[in-house]
Amino acid sequence: MYAYFRGRVVSVLPEEAVLEVSGIAYRFLISTGTSRSLPQAGNEAILYTHLSVREDALQLYGFSSEEEKQLFRLLLLVSGVGPKLALAVLSGLPVAEVHEAILANAPERLFGVTGVGRKTAARIILELRDRILKLSPPGAAATPAGAVQCGIREDATNALLTLGFSRTAAQQAVAGVLEANPGGSVEDVVKSALLAMHNR
């Protein structure tokens, strides 16, 4: 129903944020990663959104990137995983590490997440591996490398957002850097992206 909300940050806590959009304050449940990526109160931000509809309540979930929202929705497809546990997974591990654990068939990497036991970790991998493979870039689908680069792209973009750049400008700059140097670290990508935007 909603793709994203753009508005003024009212408050940010480790597990929730309030965004004011056109005079209306919306409360979102968020991961700790999204919490860290949001600017201070008073600044503008974008939260990619998932609306959970239940008989007794409507709840908005907010994400710092489309990748995080996409993984959240995939986790909801796993039997026995609801919004609370899906958000716990995203709070416990970066998106790229979850992708890597699934692609590498390594359930032990998910055990450290609160609420995820051996059976749940095994189900996540069993039920999502094929879906994650389809999401990986061509030529990288069979290895964790594609997921790692996805995480680098996400982290570098979020770093540029915290510096005040628009999401469009940040994404374009990061994409250009990764195309020229796919093996760069997050720090290298951010530095190169800043240089590229400065020279425009």
UniProtKB/Swiss-Prot annotation:
Renumbered residue ranges of the record's region Domain III: 154-200
Pfam families: HHH_5, RuvA_C, RuvA_N
Keyword DNA-binding: yes
UniProt keyword terms in alphabetical order: Cytoplasm, DNA damage, DNA recombination, DNA repair, DNA-binding
GO molecular function: ATP binding; four-way junction DNA binding; four-way junction helicase activity
Flexible linker: annotated segments: 144-154
Chain segments carrying region Domain I: 1-64
Stretch list, region Domain II: 65-143
InterPro entries registered for this protein in UniProt: DNA_helicase_Holl-junc_RuvA_I, Hlx-hairpin-Hlx_DNA-bd_motif, NA-bd_OB-fold, RuvA, RuvA_2-like, RuvA_C, RuvA_C_sf
Subcellular location: Cytoplasm
Biological processes, Gene Ontology terms: DNA recombination; DNA repair
Family: Belongs to the RuvA family.
Assembly behavior: Homotetramer. Forms an RuvA(8)-RuvB(12)-Holliday junction (HJ) complex. HJ DNA is sandwiched between 2 RuvA tetramers; dsDNA enters through RuvA and exits via RuvB. An RuvB hexamer assembles on each DNA strand where it exits the tetramer. Each RuvB hexamer is contacted by two RuvA subunits (via domain III) on 2 adjacent RuvB subunits; this complex drives branch migration. In the full resolvosome a probable DNA-RuvA(4)-RuvB(12)-RuvC(2) complex forms which resolves the HJ.
Function description: The RuvA-RuvB-RuvC complex processes Holliday junction (HJ) DNA during genetic recombination and DNA repair, while the RuvA-RuvB complex plays an important role in the rescue of blocked DNA replication forks via replication fork reversal (RFR). RuvA specifically binds to HJ cruciform DNA, conferring on it an open structure. The RuvB hexamer acts as an ATP-dependent pump, pulling dsDNA into and through the RuvAB complex. HJ branch migration allows RuvC to scan DNA until it finds its consensus sequence, where it cleaves and resolves the cruciform DNA.
Protein name (record): Holliday junction branch migration complex subunit RuvA
Species the sequence originates in: Chlorobium luteolum (strain DSM 273 / BCRC 81028 / 2530)
Source organism phylogeny: Bacteria, Pseudomonadati, Chlorobiota, Chlorobiia, Chlorobiales
